[in-house]
Amino acid sequence: MLKILIPIFLITGLVYSQQNYPADTVLASLQTNIFEKTVILPIATWQRISYNSELLACQFYPSCSNYGALAVRNYGPIIGTAITADRIVRCNPFALNYHYEMHGEFHYPDYRLVDSVQVSRPRYTSNKSPVLAAGLSTIMPGTGRMYAGRFLDGLMGLWMVLLPGTAAYGSLKDGKSIKGNFFAGITLIFYLGEIYGAYRTAKYYQGPK
């Protein structure tokens, strides 16, 4: 019972506290249900650390934490976390170069890379199949992004699936079910994120021909 009440108390405290961080608005929204708030809570907590440190500043706009909060609110906790996993994979040292290649927009005055949760239409016509990209990543995570033209993003995605997957396998093999199930859940989230990310990359993240 105490384990259930603790997140409720934390959510209530953050909702009624001063809203200084982007995720707080989503957390306090009446359109966000209790399950979504439970997922957004760690994001809001993280923003209280990352938004006060230049070393943890995100290169994207909106930031990965706020992007995740919006994704969970718009698509629910399961699909939303998968969409967030896709963004986390793309938030890597190669993001700026890929953004230049697709002639992406920049947010002023901080020049962060504009990347919205919802994209209305592709900037450029793609000769890559989003369905094929998603199918490839279903078989082998990361290969869909590689097919869509982002080889390094694909490597990052494959790594983000293999790392927790290996930890899950080792933990379950050693009889550590709680730890194993935890890492298995993370593996599933990033696996789904790879399928979504491959589709999104092929459809929206293409440069001019």
Where on the chain are the PLM-derived regions?
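Hydrophobic alpha-helical membrane segments
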Residues: V26-K209
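Bulky hydrophobic segments
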Residues: N20-T25
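Boundary at the C-terminal end of the N-terminal hydrophobic targeting segment
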Residues: V15-Q18
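Sec-dependent N-terminal signal peptides
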Residues: L2-G13
